[in-house]
From Swiss-Prot:
InterPro entries: Asp/Orn_carbamoyltranf_P-bd, Asp/Orn_carbamoylTrfase, Asp/Orn_carbamoylTrfase_sf, Asp_carbamoyltransf_Asp/Orn-bd, Orn/put_carbamltrans, OTCase_ArgI. GO terms for molecular function: amino acid binding; ornithine carbamoyltransferase activity. Keywords: Amino-acid biosynthesis, Arginine biosynthesis, Cytoplasm, Transferase. It comes from Escherichia coli O6:H1 (strain CFT073 / ATCC 700928 / UPEC). The keyword Zinc-finger does not apply. NCBIfam families: orni_carb_tr (TIGR00658), PRK12562.1 (NF009213). This is Ornithine carbamoyltransferase. Reversibly catalyzes the transfer of the carbamoyl group from carbamoyl phosphate (CP) to the N(epsilon) atom of ornithine (ORN) to produce L-citrulline. One of its GO terms (biological process) is citrulline biosynthetic process. Carbamoyl phosphate binds at residues 56-59, 83, 107, 134-137, 274-275, 320. GO terms for cellular component: cytoplasm. The lineage of its organism: Bacteria, Pseudomonadati, Pseudomonadota, Gammaproteobacteria, Enterobacterales. Pathway: Amino-acid biosynthesis; L-arginine biosynthesis; L-arginine from L-ornithine and carbamoyl phosphate: step 1/3. It catalyses: carbamoyl phosphate + L-ornithine = L-citrulline + phosphate + H(+). L-ornithine binds at residues 168, 232, 236-237.
Amino acid sequence: MSGFYHKHFLKLLDFTPAELNSLLQLAAKLKADKKSGKEEARLTGKNIALIFEKDSTRTRCSFEVAAYDQGARVTYLGPSGSQIGHKESIKDTARVLGRMYDGIQYRGYGQEIVETLAEYAGVPVWNGLTNEFHPTQLLADLLTMQEHLPGKAFNEMTLVYAGDARNNMGNSMLEAAALTGLDLRLVAPQACWPEAALVAECSALAQKHGGKITLTEDIASGVKGADFIYTDVWVSMGEPKEKWAERIALLRDYQVNSKMMALTGNSQVKFLHCLPAFHDEQTTLGKKMAAEFGLYGGMEVTDEVFESPASIVFDQAENRMHTIKAVMVATLAK
């Protein structure tokens, strides 16, 4: 993986299809090695900074466990644990941390922040999530899809994303489709479509690789023949309450439920979600949604689908760690 050494991992379109495939192959090997007890530590002596301006469960745990497995040490800098952007500029933070650490992960707000870190740190910088892109999640998704459709190329798979596609997940899915040739369908209200410029760029690239990108409001035609149906949360605790009603009214028809799964016509269709999911009333927000909007038994996905054999969301969650490990090994190990 010498071609990746000291490279950044900021968004998928920074890579070629061959490079993306190499990362997925490395992730699969690292996963197999860990499960067989044959994993070789290739990051011994490395120090990694984890900057989290937004809290996280899966991303933090994935980076920490992956680093420990490979012999590296980590420092967690949480939302209140650093001066980045407050008392110290991003540029200066990058230059300080780059003198102390071998790699830096950033999870937070604007893409320009992680890009600035990468420009000035002098060490590999990895995007754990920004407002615009979530590339590590898509690596995990692609590995999970390969595992559940073995022997099929990506340009033989159909992935549907239902719900709000104007976010970092929608953007990174477009980039993934551009590189892999997936048949990607964003099934969403038009108000929730990604920016037209990114759609056009990714559509042109997808066609070159044997795939296509479709944006539609029509659920029946959009999900027909799908191999995978994917969704994400509609609201978050950080948003004002008045936004909740507006968002739910807009997206309610796009809930992933047994009817939508059946409309695919594929008895083997699988369900994907980047988590956390509001599929029941066992969370603070889930309880509020149920009480205020009558969303009992799930918001963006029903509990029935989430807990069904079609759901592979915990395979996805596990694969966050294996794919993140691949990114760190590829960029830090000689």
